[in-house]
C-alpha cells in the first residue's frame, strides 16, 4: 500500500499506518510504503523526522511548493492508494470566494494534489464544529478587499480593541460544500463523528472523520467500530508517571506500570522526556490549590463570593471549564495545544497542583513514551494537542487496509 500524508504535523495519523498493535506492543506494519509526507511547521517536521527518519520522506515547507513535476518525481509513475491528512477546517469556510487569507487557500492545494495522484481513498479528521460551520461571505469594498471593523472586548476594568473581518452573510453548511467539491473530482464522501474513548484512548475527544473513495472502484468501506473494553480514565493513563514539582523536570521512572495501557506506553522506553512543569505566579498558584476535581473557574469564584478567598484573585476571563481540575476516575477532556496551561480547558492534574505536562498529554493522546517531540514548550504542546491519537489512527488504518485489500 502506497501512502501520502499531507499536513502531517508530528505524525499522529502516520503512526496508525506505520504501526499496528500486536500482543501489547506497537509493531511496524509490512507492505506499507509512505511515498512522502508534507508539513509546514519546522518543529513538527523535526519531530516527524525524529520518529520516522528516512522511512517516510518528508517534504518540508509550504504545500504550494510541491509542484506537479515534483509529485511526478516522487510517485515514479506508480499508483497511490491513500492520501491521509487534510487542511484545517477554516480553509473550507470561504470555499468558492475570492481569497485573501493564505490559510484559506490550503483546501485548493489539497484538491490539486488529490486530482494529480488520484488515490483510491483519502482520510482526514477535523473538529466536530465543522459539522455546524457555515460558509462565510465577508463584506468587501469596491476593489474587492475585505472590510474590517473594530470591536471592543471587556475584561473586568480593561478594554481591548481589535479588528476583524465584517461578515456580510452566512451561506450553506461547509460540510455540504465539501461533499460537493470532492464529488466533482470523482469521490464519494462519508462523514462520521467518532470519540477517542471508543478505541482505547483515555480521552473524550470527538472528531469528525471524512473518508473519500473513488466512485469508479466500488470500494466497500465501513467506519471502524470501537473495542468493547472498559473506558480508560485519566489516572489509568498517567498514574505511573512520577510527580513533578513546579519549575521542575523529571526524566526517570520511579513507579511500576499498573495496567496494560501503561505497559504499552512504556514498552521500549527507559526514560521520560517532556515531563516538566512551568513556574506559576501567586494568583495561578492560589487558583490551583483551591480547585477540586471536577471544579473550575466558577467554583473558585464562588469561594471568593463566600469570603473564603481574597477578592483580588477573582477570575474575570475564560470559559466555565477554564482552570478546571481533571477527575481521576473519568476520561480526560479533549487535549488541546493549551494542555500545559492552567487557564486552559480542564487541564489541571487530578491530584498534583499543576497543569498536565506535555508527556502526560502525549500519554493521554496514546503516544508511547519513546515518541519524540521538538521545540519550545509551546511547540511541543501544539504538536501533542493537534495530533490524531495513534490508537485511533490505527483503527482507521486497519479499516482502510481491509477495504483496499481486494482492490
Outline where the language-model segments fall.
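Conserved acidic residues
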Residues: 33-35, 41, 61-67, 81, 120, 193-197
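S-adenosyl-L-methionine
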Residues: 46-75
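Conserved S-adenosyl-L-methionine
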Residues: 1-55
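Class I S-adenosyl-L-methionine
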Residues: 70-77, 87-309
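Extracellular structured ligand-interaction cores
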Residues: 3, 205-209, 330-332
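Redox-cofactor binding/interface segments in oxidoreductases and associated redox assembly factors
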Residues: 61, 85, 124, 337
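C-terminal target-recognition/interaction regions appended to catalytic cores
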Residues: 256-407
Amino acid at each position: 500500500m502506497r501512502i501520502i500524508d499531507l499536513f502531517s504535523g508530528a505524525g499522529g495519523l502516520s503512526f496508525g499506518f506505520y504501526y499496528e498493535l500486536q500482543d501489547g506492543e506497537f509493531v511496524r506494519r509490512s507492505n506499507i510504503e509512505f511515498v512522502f509526507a508534507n508539513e509546514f511547521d519546522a518543529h513538527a517536521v523535526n519531530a516527524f523526522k525524529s520518529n520516522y527518519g528516512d522511512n517516510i520522506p518528508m517534504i518540508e515547507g509550504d504545500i504550494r511548493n510541491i509542484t506537479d513535476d515534483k509529485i511526478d518525481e516522487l510517485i515514479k509513475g506508480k499508483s497511490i492508494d491513500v492520501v491521509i491528512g487534510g487542511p484545517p477546517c477554516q480553509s473550507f469556510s470561504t470555499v468558492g470566494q475570492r481569497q485573501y487569507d493564505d490559510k484559506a487557500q490550503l483546501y485548493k492545494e489539497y484538491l490539486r494534489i488529490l486530482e494529480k495522484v488520484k488515490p483510491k481513498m483519502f482520510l482526514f479528521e477535523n473538529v466536530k464544529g465543522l459539522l455546524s460551520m457555515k460558509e462565510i461571505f465577508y463584506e468587501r469594498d469596491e476593489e474587492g478587499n475585505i472590510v474590517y471593523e473594530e470591536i471592543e472586548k471587556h475584561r473586568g476594568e480593561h478594554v481591548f480593541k481589535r479588528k476583524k473581518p465584517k461578515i456580510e452573510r452566512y451561506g450553506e453548511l461547509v460540510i455540504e460544500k465539501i461533499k460537493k467539491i470532492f464529488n466533482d473530482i470523482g469521490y464519494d464522501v462519508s462523514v462520521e463523528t467518532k470519540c477517542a474513548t471508543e478505541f482505547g484512548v483515555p480521552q473524550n475527544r470527538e472528531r469528525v472523520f471524512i473518508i473519500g473513495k473513488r466512485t469508479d472502484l466500488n470500494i466497500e468501506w465501513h467506519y471502524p467500530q470501537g473495542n468493547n473494553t472498559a473506558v480508560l480514565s485519566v489516572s489509568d493513563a498517567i498514574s505511573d508517571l512520577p510527580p513533578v514539582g513546579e519549575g521542575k523536570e523529571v526524566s526517570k521512572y520511579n513507579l511500576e506500570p499498573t495496567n496494560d495501557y501503561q505497559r504499552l506506553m512504556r514498552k521500549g522506553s527507559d526514560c521520560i522526556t517532556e515531563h516538566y512543569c512551568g513556574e506559576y505566579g501567586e494568583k495561578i498558584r492560589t487558583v490551583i490549590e483551591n480547585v477540586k476535581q471536577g471544579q473550575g473557574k466558577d467554583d473558585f469564584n464562588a469561594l471568593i463570593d463566600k469570603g473564603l478567598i481574597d477578592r483580588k484573585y477573582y477570575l474575570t476571563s475564560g470559559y466555565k471549564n477554564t482552570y478546571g481540575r481533571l477527575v481521576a476516575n473519568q476520561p480526560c477532556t479533549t487535549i488541546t495545544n493549551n494542555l500545559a496551561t492552567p487557564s486552559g480547558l480542564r487541564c489541571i492534574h487530578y491530584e498534583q497542583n499543576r497543569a498536565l505536562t506535555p508527556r502526560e498529554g502525549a500519554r493521554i493522546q496514546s503516544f508511547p513514551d519513546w515518541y519524540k517531540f521538538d521545540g519550545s514548550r509551546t511547540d511541543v504542546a501544539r504538536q501533542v494537542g493537534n495530533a490524531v491519537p495513534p490508537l485511533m489512527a490505527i483503527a482507521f488504518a486497519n479499516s482502510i487496509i481491509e477495504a483496499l485489500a481486494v482492490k
